[in-house]
């Protein structure tokens, strides 16, 4: 599932998965390529070229309460090969319902498409992306009133860009 968000001019991947038997055969890469193609087409309908794609990922270094269906270090290697890096920001997903808690231990990852964004993403774009994602995908009407969003917004507002660390480097496998 991919959403195109016009304000940050970005695609957000909510889900991209393959059954275990199909892994290692290029299915995930093909799904990502099609999602990227669709996001680019959506951006062009607004008169712009797509600037980036973002997603959430379990932080491989943080133990989760629910077992992951894939080794998180393997997942990080795969997404690295697909061109994604970890955004160096304090991202916490707000609770999905009143009965749940906010989800810590996640990385916000990004694949820059815009020239000049290989090492960092403009802070305003990160802020806009998360606000629009919360509004449209999570149905949080006023992201500014959400404590998890406010913490991220306050953090990004103090800098011009958010550093983008290649996922292989993040997991310690590359200089």
Can you annotate each of these PLM segments?
Residues 1-22:
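A conserved beta-strand-loop-helix scaffold within acyl/acetyltransferase catalytic domains
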Residues 8-11, 26, 30, 34, ...:
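Short, well-structured alpha-helical interface segments that form or flank functional binding sites
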Residues 11, 25-28, 39, 65-67, ...:
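Generic alpha-helix signal with a bias toward terminal, lower-confidence helices
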Residues 14, 36, 56:
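Acidic-residue sensor for enzyme active/binding pockets
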Residues 18, 24-41:
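Conserved acetyl-CoA-binding loop-helix of GNAT-fold acetyltransferases
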Residues 20-23, 60-62:
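A short acidic, glycine/proline-enriched capping/turn motif at secondary-structure boundaries
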Residues 44-175:
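Terminal substrate-recognition subdomain of acyl/acetyltransferases
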